[in-house]
Amino acid sequence: MVVPFECTAEDVQSAGFSCSEEAPCPIYLELSAATAKGNKYYVVGNIHSDAVTLYSVLLGSEDAGATWQEIHPRIRLSGLDHLQFLDADTGWAGGQQLFPLPQEPFVLLTSDAGKNWRQQPVLGEDADKRYGSIQEMHFSSKTDGGVIIDRSQGGDAGPFALYESPDGGASWSLKEQNAKPLHLKGAPDQDADWRMRVDPGAKAFLLEERRGERWISHAAFSVNLGMCKVPPPR
């Protein structure tokens, strides 16, 4: 599958990089996490150039990977890299804005198997700094969840922070800050039975499921999305 993408002048201007018909820029897809419930598959990632991340991507399939749709609008200058579904209906995707530095971490939440999503910021309006990226995300129930935020790129003296949510990701509060890396207690790795793997020969991301000691491929997504060629203004 090739995720459709057409570069616009607004994309180039907002990201602050140069692409023209004379010097086009290659555009790539990166997929970082995957999970599934029954025949419903989900993957997340971003669309980027060599220089900058352009958009987040959230893809879903309702037929075991045979066909795919984008199930959330792309978020400009952002990426998604965490994904969890607790049951067939309840799920979360975590990410952040990535330009010019990782900032404004957020969680997307759904209660209807990905048909609708709500975007909720992790940092409160009173947070003195907006920089940070989600390093870990886990929900132990439909209500209780946590994220670890790394704020080191923003120059924070105590860069690691634990935020918890008591209402399924609708709101978040700061619980701990530390100069040393923090980890969510009892949180497993991202779905150990599903993964995205780069196949260099095929230039594709493969969605794979663990079955015993083997990995079975269910879908392939092209890394290359074409060239960004923005004509000069007239």
Please report, for each region that a protein language model flagged, where it lies by residue.
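Extracellular glycan-interacting surfaces
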Residues: 1-234
